[in-house]
């Protein structure tokens, strides 16, 4: 924390997990210490976890010297909701994303403008009920008129909250799937009657929360999914932090004499095509041994 103390809950969790070595440091300087090593901090092989812009830049600069998980940006959620969804629940999920700080993005893909308005009103009510916001923040919850963006209509909902719905003549489900895959959200919530069917069209998302009873908040704390997820569209090519981040795959190859004899002729042709004569010779020596 800002006072230099380590959160007691973090220390307790570390102890329960068998961690017996904890270093109290943070920021870009922590990344440098872990990557290069110091008199008190041993050098590591992998650095994981999100941070601010300085931490991201530090991780980018040491990548190659050590492995990193990702360059995590501001948190994101995209909620896809049909007409059967509960606007108040959707509103609460969007507002929860704002709690991750400035830059956090919360998007809604809705079936029509009426649903967007209902969610906007629910946001106003929830902000007034739960947050006791200042007049400045309360002013953000007004719902301005829509702006057409072609096949999809965008409607600001307030702050970093934005809602979209299909333009006239556009089908909701295909457009929603296209938005999901183009945006590649960190968190994707599906408030849909047939959420499982919609899943077949989803190719890019960090974590997917299926059904109206599965908000992102459960994934943040207790559902068991990892909270360190790809952001900024990187879900198109990256995955969540997991045990696999800390594992390395190795190829183990072993041939007996007979196998070497069978594989040497095709290897020789491939090697010759590239002009790698010693690759061919290396293999043919084993083939000759197999023939004896």
Question: What is each of the regions a protein language model found here?
Answer:
Residues 16-107:
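Conserved NAD(P)+-binding/catalytic subdomain of aldehyde/semialdehyde dehydrogenases
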Residues 21-26, 142, 147, 162-172:
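Short acidic-hydrophobic, aromatic-tinged amphipathic segments that line or gate anion-handling sites
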Residues 20-23, 44-48, 52-53, 69, ...:
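Structural motif
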Residues 3-17:
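Active-site-proximal loop->helix
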């Amino acid at each position: 924390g800002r006072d230099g103390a380590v959160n007691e809950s973090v220390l307790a969790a570390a102890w329960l997990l068998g961690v017996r070595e904890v270093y109290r440091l943070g920021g870009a300087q922590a990344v440098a210490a872990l990557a290069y090593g110091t008199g008190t901090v041993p050098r590591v092989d992998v650095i994981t976890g999100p941070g601010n812009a300085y931490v991201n830049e530090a991780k980018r600069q040491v990548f190659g010297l050590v492995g990193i998980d990702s360059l995590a940006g501001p948190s994101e959620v995209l909620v896809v909701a049909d007409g059967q969804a509960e606007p108040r629940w959707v509103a609460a999920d969007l507002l929860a994303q704002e709690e991750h700080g400035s830059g956090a993005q919360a998007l809604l893909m809705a079936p029509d403008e009426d649903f967007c308005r209902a969610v906007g009103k629910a946001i106003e009510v929830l902000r007034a009920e739960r947050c006791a916001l200042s007049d400045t923040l309360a002013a953000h919850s007004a719902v301005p008129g829509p702006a057409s963006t072609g096949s999809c209509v965008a409607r600001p909902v307030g702050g970093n909250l934005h809602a979209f719905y299909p333009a006239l003549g556009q089908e909701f489900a295909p457009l929603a799937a296209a938005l999901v895959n183009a945006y590649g959200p960190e968190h994707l919530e599906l408030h849909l009657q047939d959420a499982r069917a919609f899943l077949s069209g989803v190719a890019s998302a960090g974590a997917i929360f299926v059904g109206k009873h599965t908000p992102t908040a459960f994934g943040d704390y207790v559902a068991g999914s990892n909270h360190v997820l790809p952001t900024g569209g990187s879900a198109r090519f990256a995955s969540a932090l997991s045990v696999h981040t800390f594992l390395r795959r190795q190829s183990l190859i072993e041939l007996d004499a007979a196998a070497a004899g069978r594989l040497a002729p095709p290897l020789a042709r491939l090697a010759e095509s590239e002009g790698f004569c010693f690759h061919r010779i290396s293999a043919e020596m084993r083939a000759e041994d197999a023939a004896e």
